[in-house]
């Protein structure tokens, strides 16, 4: 107990956080570190849960979602796909493609006619010109009005980590505010808009979480959903009856399923190479399918609040200072190896907890600050004990001397006042005048 309540431990802990701030805000431009930094800039330890642990287990497919490849088909062929799919009454059809301007009149007319006949169609939109001052987008890009008037819109923007040139998608925004004309309106994400048609209650539960950004709980790549190639849908002999009551997503899945492309592809946590990634692993359409699946199944990821992350880092760092103080007093010769063992043990335990919590409980803990504090704690403790503590002791002694002197001066003043007051007449208890 005597070690725990020691102000020196508090000062050393605060010094660790000062060092962390210095690391964060002081730019390091060291040439030989650059290649390593680029390789690991986009690395997240939690990616291993999706790329290793869950991929090793047979994750079940989501049969409520159907993916349809539109490849680079002309508009009249996409119209034919849409007509065939709509005839079997899916719950909703989402088209992850823009039709920004008129092309061939006959093809445009066919597509507009197919959109008009289909029920519950959602076309993608794109949010642009974000204004950080008020958190509003100034522009919403959509398809041409001849197509867009027959559909709802949902924005396809996702949250992308662009460090090191990668486009890793780990999260998305369910709802954003857009300034149109003189008013500001809320717009739902493409995936959220689609999910509403199949289960509005599930979407309500999702939106009631009121998170500005949601982590995506990936189910898997397109093999975890019903998937149809472009020609399969156009083939009149293909039975499409199974799409009834399901969510259908139409978009680019390569020139064909057998001929993949890098167009509209992203890095995700499912990428087998977590660090120093080479090729993106998932089409944008499949990312939307994973989000729809997560919402409908209610399999959300809960992120650790920032205040809790900071509190945990402070408590662990403070506990380290207490432990190091104990070790250096009782096992001084073994302090160096023991302190290293403590730090390594903490790293192993925290990383295990990080992975286990996400894998088993879909809880994404943020131990970045805690791990950084653990790494710096031993070195900072030694610096404080050997160099800064004598300065703190000197300052504390001078402050105490000054306070003691001020207290003695006050006592002298009070004593003098009391002595002088003895010669002053006082009133009588009878109330008679003096």
Language-model features: where?
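Intrinsically disordered/low-complexity terminal segments and short unstructured peptides
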Residues: 141-142, 155-157, 161-163, 167, ...
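Short clusters of hydrophobic/aromatic residues that line enzyme substrate/ligand-binding pockets
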Residues: 216, 233, 270
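Low-complexity, intrinsically disordered short peptide segments enriched in small/polar/basic residues
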Residues: 89, 213, 230, 415-416, ...
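Non-transmembrane functional regions of envelope-associated proteins
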Residues: 2-206, 243-338, 342-350, 376-377, ...
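General structural signal for secondary-structure boundaries
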Residues: 44, 226-229, 283, 305, ...
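A Trp-anchored, charged/polar loop motif used as the substrate-binding/catalytic surface
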Residues: 224-241
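Alpha-helical transmembrane segments forming the membrane-embedded cores
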Residues: 309, 330-434
